[in-house]
UniProtKB/Swiss-Prot annotation:
MF-aspect GO terms: DNA binding
Tissues expressing the protein: Expressed in embryos (at protein level).
Gene Ontology terms: cellular component: alpha DNA polymerase:primase complex; nuclear envelope; nucleus
Protein name as it appears in the record: DNA polymerase alpha subunit B
Similarity remark: Belongs to the DNA polymerase alpha subunit B family.
PTM notes: Phosphorylated in embryos until cycle 13.
Function noted in UniProt: Accessory subunit of the DNA polymerase alpha complex (also known as the alpha DNA polymerase-primase complex) which plays an essential role in the initiation of DNA synthesis. During the S phase of the cell cycle, the DNA polymerase alpha complex (composed of a catalytic subunit PolA1, an accessory subunit PolA2 and two primase subunits, the catalytic subunit Prim1 and the regulatory subunit Prim2) is recruited to DNA at the replicative forks. The primase subunit of the polymerase alpha complex initiates DNA synthesis by oligomerising short RNA primers on both leading and lagging strands.
Localization per record: Nucleus
Gene designation: PolA2
Organism per entry: Drosophila melanogaster (Fruit fly)
Location, primary (coarse class): nucleus
UniProt cross-references to Pfam families, sorted A to Z: DNA_pol_E_B, DPOA2_OB, Pol_alpha_B_N
Highest rank taxon of the organism: Eukaryota
InterPro entries: DNA_pol_a/d/e_bsu, DNA_pol_alpha_B_N_sf, DNA_pol_alpha_bsu, DPOA2_OB, Pol_alpha_B_N
Subunit structure: Component of the alpha DNA polymerase complex (also known as the alpha DNA polymerase-primase complex) consisting of four subunits: the catalytic subunit PolA1, the regulatory subunit PolA2, and the primase complex subunits Prim1 and Prim2 respectively. PolA1 associates with the DNA primase complex before association with PolA2.
Length: 609
């Protein structure tokens, strides 16, 4: 028996001492458990439910005997037939099965896992079932909101990490690491909602009056001809706007343009061209790899529309692949365009003035929500504890929630959809009905469709205050416009742009989104694994009007920037090796007689978790 037990424990990644194996064999014989696999499975479920995945030891085997084995024996003794139980119920397809999930369930139903469902005399003496814990986030170690079903014991997962991210954390939880807003507004806020108020949520990124959902999604049909057409649409929308901003209609009429006036290569006023930036190798740009595709409906299709760009004369520039620009310069010979000026700004449609009549409290947090070495989701539990104490009006969560590249994803013994449902259920249970919860999943999520823009996954259970949003999203919250994405477009832009004397990098990356009118203006995408769909992007990723606040999660350092009177926030990552962070901000109602502006109306902080 000991050898069989040792083999089963080995398969679970557990190496108990010989004395412990002897005690396990003794317990198995005493309680008529003749199958080593059954004994080990019962121990693993008990360990993960009560001991946070500890390995078996002489001390905790005593608890196991009292709470599981003895209880099972008592139950069997009170059966109407008087016969000993030889089966403890078949595994259920529900999440409550101990064989399907070694996790903590809502009511911790150990009896349901180990004892058959036959009737039991209510007057029998037995160990009472533990009461449901009311404060599930008060003690992280003692009460998990949800636990992943796994083929590998949690203790083995914990040992797999040689160093936990917290070992290199700078600062302590609760530290404020970034701030924006009027000092009086910051000092006067308790960062708690003052009254219960239902915040209406209305999606504004629509096509044919409908947001992006799985029901109206048609993808994997992005033909090359369609991509070319969609790029031309972007060109035709942005190019004239750049010309109008810089030159105006009258000024544009006086300029010499390429390719219409391509015969006039030398001119006193310079040559102008509107085109789309590309890279020779589809990678990051540099001073020698950029070329510009110039399109014009009046020029024959046979003409080569590309110009190689030379930046030796330029004083300031910031370009990236897929960007539509207005360039000024000359062509000394061949197809080389000597750039003297490059213009990328157009007239922007400003955000709708703030129209709220009461203070709104927001919390914004971005995934990943668990460390890279385990699936315990401890940073998420810490965040939920903060939310339970502060009760904001709106909570914005962006993915990834279950990163498909996480090293432990392959150990899950349940579907990704089921795991995500459990996670959302735990979040909603902890937060309650007071807070409106906006969830924006990522195409990096294992349970999400791998396409950008990304529709929200469908949930079997609905909650009145839960809003599953696509990536990207633009929503109206009681007169306040919020833009949000889970895609790291800031990092993608900065890693692929070519910049010369272009100013502060975060500011210019944000401006790229505004002036290109897109949540993701790069083409081709910076991430090779990103399944970019140009047709969906044309319908559901345009940024035609500035929001009041824009959420741009990024692996770049957390930041708060005011750009074109839009407050842009990178809250950082909840789980980060250098210490997780999240953002909180409040929007105050306008004071009668005073002009509303973001500095006086919005206060924001990034806080360490």
């Amino acid at each position: 028996m000991e050898e069989e037990l040792k083999q089963q424990f080995d398969e679970m990644g557990v190496e108990p001492a010989d004395a412990v194996l002897g005690r396990c064999a003794e317990l198995a014989i005493t309680y008529n458990i003749h199958d080593a696999t059954e004994f080990v499975e019962q121990w693993m479920a008990f360990s993960l439910s009560h001991l946070q995945g500890e390995d078996p030891a002489i001390e905790n085997l005593g608890d196991f005997e009292r709470k599981v084995l003895q209880l099972r024996k008592d139950k069997a003794g009170y059966k109407a037939t008087g016969q000993k139980a030889k089966s403890y119920g078949s595994p259920s397809v529900q999440d409550t099965s101990s064989l399907a999930t070694y996790g903590v369930m809502e009511d911790d139903p150990m009896l349901d896992d180990y004892v058959s469902e036959s009737a039991v005399d209510s007057s029998a003496l037995h160990t009472p079932k533990a009461k449901k814990q009311s404060d599930r986030t008060a003690n992280l170690k003692g009460a998990a909101l949800f636990s992943p079903a796994s083929y590998t014991p949690q203790s083995a997962k914990r040992k797999a990490g040689l160093e936990t991210p917290s070992n290199s954390v700078a600062g302590k939880p609760g530290d404020i690491v970034d701030t924006f807003g009027h000092p009086k507004l910051l000092a006067g806020s308790s960062w708690q909602s003052q009254m219960e108020h239902t915040v209406p949520v209305t999606q504004k990124l629509l096509h044919n009056d409908a947001p992006l959902t799985i029901a109206n999604l048609g993808y994997m049909n992005d033909l090359l001809t369609d991509r070319c057409h969609n790029l031309r649409v972007r060109f035709n929308q942005t190019g004239p706007a750049l010309v109008d901003k810089k030159l105006g209609q009258a000024g544009a009429a006086e300029c010499i343009w390429y390719p219409q006036d391509r015969q006039v290569l030398q001119s006193a006023g310079g040559l102008h061209a509107v085109g789309m930036i590309h890279s020779e190798d589809d990678g990051p740009l540099d001073a020698h790899s950029a070329f510009m595709a110039v399109l014009d409906d009046d020029v024959e299709d046979e003409m080569d529309p590309t110009l190689t760009l030379n930046f030796s004369r330029v004083k300031s520039a910031s370009i990236f692949p897929g960007q539509v620009v207005l360039a000024k310069g000359f062509i000394p010979r061949g197809k080389t365009f000597m750039v003297e000026e490059i213009h990328t700004e157009r007239k922007l449609t400003p955000a709708t003035p703030l129209q709220i009549d009461r203070e709104l409290q927001f919390v914004v947090a971005s995934g990943p929500f668990t460390d890279s070495t385990d699936l315990f989701y401890e940073p998420l539990h810490d965040l939920l504890k903060y939310l339970k104490d502060h009760r904001p009006d709106v909570l914005v969560l962006t993915g990834p929630f279950l990163d498909a590249d996480h090293k432990m994803v392959g150990e899950l013994a349940e579907t990704f959809d089921t795991f995500f449902e459990k996670m959302i259920g735990g979040i909603m249970e902890s937060i309650g009905s007071h807070t409106a919860v906006l969830v924006v999943t990522s195409q990096k999520d294992a349970m999400a469709l791998s396409v950008y823009p990304t529709p929200p996954p469908a949930l079997r259970r609905t909650y009145p205050n839960l809003y599953m949003l696509p990536d990207p999203s633009l929503v109206d919250l009681d007169g306040f416009t919020l833009g949000v994405t889970s895609t790291d477009v800031v990092d993608h832009l900065l890693s692929h742009e070519f910049a010369v004397n272009a100013g502060e990098r975060m500011h210019r990356a944000i401006n790229h989104l505004f002036h290109q009118g897109s949540f993701y203006p790069l083409y081709p995408p910076a991430d090779e694994d990103m399944a970019y769909d140009s047709q969906l992007a044309l319908k559901y990723a345009q940024l035609k009007q500035l929001p009041n606040v824009l959420i741009l999660p990024s692996d770049q350092r957390h930041f708060i920037r005011l750009v074109n009177d839009c407050l842009v926030i990178n809250p950082g990552r909840v789980a980060d090796k250098k210490g997780g962070t999240f953002a909180r901000f409040l929007v105050a109602p306008s004071v009668p007689g005073k002009a509303a502006n973001m500095f006086n109306s919005v206060a924001c902080q990034v806080q360490r978790i």
